[in-house]
Amino acid sequence: AAGADIMTTNTFGANRLKYDKDGELKAIVEAAVANARKAADEAGRGYIALDLGPTGKLLKPLGDLPFEAAVSLYKEVVSIGAAAGADLVLIETMSDSYELKAAVLAAKEAGIDPKTGERLPIFATVIYDEKGKLLTGGDVPAVIAMLEGLRVDALGINCGMGPEQMLPVVEELIRYASVPVI
């Protein structure tokens, strides 16, 4: 049947930096997971991906957000999303390998299925430029090595350029990755 097998939650920008009123972040994440689950249930199939995007702040030393604070921001969202019933964590549109690492560590620590006690699968995608570099300079092999070292379940590229410009980067991802490329 046509359609999507993975539904993403509408939580790309949801974090304590943007939603700091009492209970606001929790309500947003829970509603997003519930809405995605409803769509999957209506379709009769589908997994729910808790969608995590960049915090909107640069991490130190390039910016003012400490690494530990970034981990904490992501852990809060992942904890709420996992408790609400997300099936996996999708970290996407990352341009800083340090922030990407913070998000993955948070997902590993807080992304526990409350029913099974198992870690939720983690997918991670980044934004490369046409030279295969992140905003902060990391290249394809370095990002793959980091993500595979952190034991993500799948990795890939999204946004930033069109399909023709992405093709050489995707080919490099496929050449070096030992986990599924998304």
Where does each model-flagged region fall?
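Domain-level signal for soluble alpha/beta catalytic cores
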Residues: 1-182
